[in-house]
């Protein structure tokens, strides 16, 4: 393939309190390294701490990172100004929304070169909607074409490409008459993240008395991330509402995760470790899970006492027997290494949860409804008894993600539509 675009400026790295968010940027960069190695991707981060910068230096030693912001006088640093001058395209990285309006608007006014979105969700319903994935799909179909704000539609319609990380976003944007960009399925960049810190992982397992291939990981979550508490800010009214929802549902939801832990220990005879995808989950696990797990099982359960780095997490996931997660990105990281995984989807979660069905694994997702405990017990029992089908499922998800990422990367670089590459789980596949 002959490239028409040689330099991509990636606006990404939204947060460091979630290893899933941390994985977005290096995942997108790895996708370009694998499928368009002749292209340079420059990372323009929103938020990076030294821990994450160190990981990037080890995982992607050739990656150029430029810092700075945009204001009335333009770029705040010479390095950002140079990156903008040299970029053929501005690319909004994978994430929960198309939220970098200031940067996109400035680029449109002052630069005029192409821009696009790579692996994003645009959820018109959540929050505050509480629904299963089938219910969300029905609601998306019922929204009027005038639902999205005009400025959002204009920004999306002005893009060169909008690659949606799941088909509910794709359906939303099509129904809202977003017609000008190459509007297509394009997976979350996290699917391409493959870096691990095997040394740190081995040290952690040794310290906890765990053996590679002989333990399972369990990831807890609240229905809403408590950002006011995480960042030490005064809560807004909406955050107060979310906190009330969290407090009312935490026992119910974590009881399902506890059922998965009980089943794993009982059926496999092997230990479990409870680990965080987000920083607040360390306290959450210690406060709630011991009382939800039986005393005879609790001796086989380790609770990680710190928020771990992404590369250590992937190193542990890569040598585990199973990852059961209430967060969306740990199953992605596990699937990359062909590890059996289950995603427990809470009813407040966004349409991003659809991504697994789009990649050919709808059964990877278990909705936290009234049947969830029984469903997860059966699923964990099956994996503990015969993991081969779940290993094959994870391999399939990773392979399908690679195919879709390859198409998205090459289309972005060539400045051409993806074409007929529908997601595996879609009706068009």
Describe the residue ranges of each PLM region.
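Active-site anion-handling motifs in enzyme catalytic cores
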Residues: 2-429
């Amino acid at each position: 393939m002959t490239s028409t675009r040689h330099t991509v400026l990636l606006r990404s790295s939204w947060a460091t309190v979630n290893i899933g968010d941390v994985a977005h940027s290096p995942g997108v960069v790895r996708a370009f390294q694998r499928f368009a190695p002749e292209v340079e991707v420059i990372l323009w981060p929103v938020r990076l701490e030294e821990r994450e910068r160190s990981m990037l230096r080890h995982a992607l030693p050739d990656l150029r990172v430029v810092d700075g912001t945009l204001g009335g006088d333009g770029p705040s640093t010479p390095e950002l100004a140079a990156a903008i001058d040299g970029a053929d395209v501005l690319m909004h990285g994978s994430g929960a929304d198309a939220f970098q309006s200031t940067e996109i608007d400035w680029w449109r006014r002052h630069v005029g070169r192409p821009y696009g979105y790579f692996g994003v969700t645009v959820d018109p319903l959540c929050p505050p909607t509480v629904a299963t994935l089938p219910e969300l799909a029905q609601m998306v179909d019922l929204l009027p074409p005038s639902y999205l704000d005009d400025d959002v539609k204009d920004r999306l319609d002005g893009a060169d490409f909008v690659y949606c990380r799941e088909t509910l976003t794709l359906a939303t944007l099509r129904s809202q008459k977003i017609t000008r960009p190459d509007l297509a399925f394009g997976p979350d960049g996290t699917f391409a993240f493959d870096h691990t810190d095997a040394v740190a992982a081995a040290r952690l397992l040794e310290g906890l008395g765990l053996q590679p291939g002989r333990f399972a990981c369990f990831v807890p979550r609240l229905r809403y991330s408590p950002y006011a508490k995480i960042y030490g800010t005064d809560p807004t009214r909406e955050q107060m509402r979310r906190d009330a929802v969290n407090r009312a549902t935490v026992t119910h939801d974590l009881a399902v995760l506890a059922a998965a832990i009980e089943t794993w220990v009982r059926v496999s005879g092997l230990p479990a470790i409870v680990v965080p995808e987000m920083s607040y989950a360390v306290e959450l696990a210690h406060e709630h899970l011991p009382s939800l797990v039986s005393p005879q099982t609790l001796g086989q359960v380790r609770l990680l006492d710190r928020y771990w780095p992404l590369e250590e997490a992937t190193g542990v996931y890569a040598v585990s027997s199973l990852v059961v997660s209430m967060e969306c990105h740990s199953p992605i990281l596990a699937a990359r290494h062909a590890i059996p995984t289950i995603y427990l989807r809470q009813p407040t979660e966004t349409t991003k949860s659809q991504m697994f069905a789009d990649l050919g694994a709808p059964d990877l997702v278990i909705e936290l409804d009234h049947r969830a405990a029984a469903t997860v017990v059966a699923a964990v029992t099956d994996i503990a008894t015969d993991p081969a089908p779940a290993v094959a499922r994870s391999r399939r998800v990773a392979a399908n993600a690679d195919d879709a990422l390859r198409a998205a990367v090459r289309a972005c670089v060539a400045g051409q539509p993806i074409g007929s590459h529908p997601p595996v789980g879609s009706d068009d596949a």
